[in-house]
Structures are given as structure tokens and as C-alpha cells.
Amino acid sequence: MERLTLPYFDEREASIDTIVIHCLAYDVEDALKSFVQNEVSAHFLIDEKGKIYNLVDEQKRAWHAGISFWKGKTNLNHNSVGIELCSPMLGQSPYPMRQISALIRLCQHLKRKYHIKKERIIGHSDIAPTRKPDPGKAFPWHFLARRGLGIWYNKKNAKKIAVEDEKALLEKIGYDVTNQNAARWAFIRHFMPAFIPTDTVENLLKKPYPDEIKIDMPLLIQTLKAVLFEIEK
């Protein structure tokens, strides 16, 4: 791990209980330029070869989440560790295994150190669905979940959840449902990525969700219920 300190941080106002995974369409050099230009940061940056850069001390509040919400909490900068991944297509093409292996090692270390629950390892698009598309449809959530990082689901467990309303399910999982369409798309990107079309990086950054979402609603409700079961069990 290499230390490259950024000055864009301040003091935390809450203890660490969440990991937020991001990606950006830059290599390390351009990522650092972008951080400086926009006066933002993350605690860690992982390049495509799996090299980890520590940019902000974990005990400090990095400026990575922006306007955000998850399970009733706003401003996730306060209570989270932010990890950025270099991804030229903004998470729309497969991540190199070396990069994912490095991420897994880092997340497992942080999870043990701060006693982070697996369901509190989430993506930037989960906490900011109207603004952000990362870490993208190609991020291997299922692969990480098999290693105790984040959650995945079994559709058979949907029948164990009585709730049927989409908005209520999204809210119980953790999403900000002020814009239900954006929350729905963020959920689909995370848990049903096969339904997410590939787009240009420019378009994704302009608007990370479509105005109209065509999806098999019974399948969506089933998946929502199955995910909620994993959180509540």
C-alpha cells in the first residue's frame, strides 16, 4: 500500500459502520488530478493492477459520499470509509481480478477492524441514486457476498417477507425513496445488473437513471423481498 495524502478531509462526527465502494473512469494519475480539481477525496484508491493507495487516514472524514442517504442516515461521509476503483468504463466492463482481490483484502480488514456488518458494504449509487452510477453494473457483488462482504439473495426466500409494496421494500432495504424511480434503478443496478444497458460514461455521469424503467414488476418485487430477507434474517 502506498500513501498519497490528499488535504480534503475533516473530523468525523460519527463512528465508522459502513464501507462505500465507488469507481471513476480514470487511471491513478488522472484520478488524483480530479480529486484536486474538485476538492474531494476517498480513503483508498485501487488501480486496475490491484495496487492500493491510501489517500486519507481512516479516522478522518474523507469527502467521497456527497449528498447521500442510507437507512435513515444522511451524509454518509460521517460514518463511512470510501474506496475508489479505477474503471475506464465506469463499472460497465468486468473489473480485473487483481483489482477485486485487493478490494476484498482491504474490505475484510476494515470489516474486522470496525466490526462492520456485511449489509453495510454498499455502492455509491445505493446512497446517491439520483446522482451516481458507480460502482456500476459489472461490479461483482455476488462474488464479494460469497466472501462475507455485502449481501446477495436467494429468490426462494422472498416468500418469507410479507411486504409487497415496492416503495416500502426499497425504504426498508435502505434507499432514499424521495425519487422512487432513481432508487429502483440503483437497486436493479446492484442486484439485477443483467437488466442494465451499457451506456457512455458521459451519459451516465449526466444522468445515472432513465426517466422510464421497463422491468418485470413481479420479478422486481420478488428480488426486493429476497434482498430484504437477507438483511432482516
What are these regions (language model features)?
Residues M89, Y95-K233:
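Basic/polar, cationic surfaces and motifs that engage anionic cell-wall
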